[in-house]
């Protein structure tokens, strides 16, 4: 039976050049894997939470008619030769070096809210089936005031909220981690072998930094995008 899937991206504000390029690239990928595509704009999940927190909209009832929902940052790109259907791949989100560090940090800072025993996913990519989305949504039964603890730029934000909801929903971390290739930073080796490339400002893991558009253009010039 053919699955009914959708790929989402989110942005709050006026789209920049790289955002538009990412949208076009991901729309092309969505067409290849037979998924719908939609850009979510503004602050539909909560008008008082930061822009990244709006990714929580992916678990709302408006998407219940879809089997899988994939949420991608708006600086993610599929390489030219990447033909793998992510909807056939196991996992929900990223849990690599950065996420492991942030997981430790959120548990240290919020020991009554966070836990080492439940999953923590990076915010650049989430892939959730309907049962998980409904479970997370159903766990959001209390006042949303606790979400304000993560309502600061670069302070857990959507990652922190999803982590707490995963705890309350009793989500087992086993099998929820995506292969790192599905969110490979642009400065890492062999970007042509990535599932999705996450365009960053760094040129190498150690730096220096430059505009993301320059790093995007370097990937285009190399024939990867």
What spans do the regions from the language model cover?
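Short His-Asn-centered micro-motif
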Residues: 9-10, 41, 72-74, 80, ...
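ER/Golgi luminal nucleotide-sugar-dependent glycosyltransferases, focusing on the catalytic module
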Residues: 48-50, 87, 93-121, 180-183, ...
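A short secondary-structure junction signal
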Residues: 81-82, 104-108, 135-141
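Aromatic-acidic/polar surface patches that form glycan- and anion
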Residues: 15-22, 48-52, 115-121, 151-158
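Residues that flank catalytic or metal-binding motifs in active/ligand-binding sites
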Residues: 3, 55, 72, 121-122, ...
């Amino acid at each position: 039976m053919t699955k009914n899937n959708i790929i989402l991206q989110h942005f709050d504000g006026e789209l920049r050049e790289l955002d538009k390029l990412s949208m076009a690239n991901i729309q092309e990928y969505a067409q290849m894997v037979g998924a719908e595509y939609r850009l979510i704009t503004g602050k539909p999940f909560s008008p008082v939470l930061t822009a990244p927190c709006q990714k929580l909209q992916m678990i709302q009832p408006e998407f219940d008619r879809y089997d899988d929902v994939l949420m991608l940052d708006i600086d993610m790109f599929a390489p030219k030769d990447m033909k793998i259907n992510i909807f056939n791949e196991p996992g929900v989100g990223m849990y690599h070096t950065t996420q492991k560090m942030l997981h430790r940090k959120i548990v240290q800072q919020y020991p009554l809210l966070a836990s080492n025993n439940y999953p923590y996913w990076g915010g650049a990519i989430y892939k959730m089936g309907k049962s998980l989305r409904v479970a997370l949504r159903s766990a959001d039964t209390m006042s949303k005031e606790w979400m304000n603890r993560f309502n600061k730029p670069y302070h857990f934000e959507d990652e922190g909220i999803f982590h707490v909801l995963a705890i309350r929903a009793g989500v087992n971390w086993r099998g929820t981690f995506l292969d790192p290739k599905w969110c490979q930073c642009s400065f890492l080796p062999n970007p042509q072998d990535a599932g999705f490339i996450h365009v960053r400002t760094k040129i190498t893991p150690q730096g220096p930094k430059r505009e993301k558009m320059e790093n995007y253009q370097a990937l285009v010039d190399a024939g990867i995008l």
